Amino acid sequence: MLNNLTPSQQQYDRQVAYWLLLCAVVIFGMILLGGVTRLTDSGLSMVDWKPIKGIIPPITQADWQAMFAKYQQFPEYQKTNFTMTLEEFKPIFMYEYLHRMLGRFIGIIFVLPFLFFYFTKRIAHGLTPRLVVMLLLGGSQGLLGWYMVKSGLVDNPHVSQYRLTAHLGLAVFIYGFIVWTVLDLLAPKLSHPKH
C-alpha cells in the first residue's frame, strides 16, 4: 500500500540541492574540458554553430573530409595550420565537439529536472526566480561561447582574450551561483527563539 504522505519541503529542498550539485559537478568538468580545448588550440576547429543540427559528429571519411574542407577555408588553417593533415585535424575537432556536446548535456540535465520539480511543486517558495536566472545564464554562456569563437574566425586566427575571459568568467560565476544555492538549500535553517 502506498504511503499517502508527501515528503516535507526539507526533503524536496534536498532533492533540488542534489540535482543542482550534479549540475555543478558537470559544469566543473566543462570548465576543465574548456581548458583542454584552449590549451590544445582546438576551439576554432568547428567553424559553424548549429545548436540543434550539430549533434552528430562526422562519422564517415567523406564526413570528415567535408568538415576538414570547411576548416581549411578559415584563417587558422590558412595562416597557422596549413600543413595539418586530416588525421591531425580529427583530435582537435573532437575536443571542441565534446565541449559543445557537454554544453548541450548540461542544458538537458538542468531543464528536464527543473520542469519536473516545477510542475510537481517541489521547488521552495522564492527559489524559482533564482533557477530561471541560472537557466538564462546557461543559455547566455552558449551564445557567449560562439561569440568568442567567431572572434577567431576572421583575419586574426586567435580568439579575443576579452571574450575568452568573459566566457570563462561567466562559467565560474554560474558554477559559484549554483554551489551557493546548493549550500543555501542544504544548510540547516536557523530558527530564532521567541522572547
What are these regions (language model features)?
Residues 120-128, 190-195:
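Membrane-interface helix-boundary motifs at transmembrane edges
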Residues 1-12, 187-195:
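Membrane-interfacial, low-structure loops and terminal tails that flank and connect transmembrane helices
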Residues 69-108:
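Individual transmembrane alpha-helix segments
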Residues 18, 125-138:
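Membrane-interfacial loop-to-transmembrane alpha-helix junctions, especially the N-terminal start
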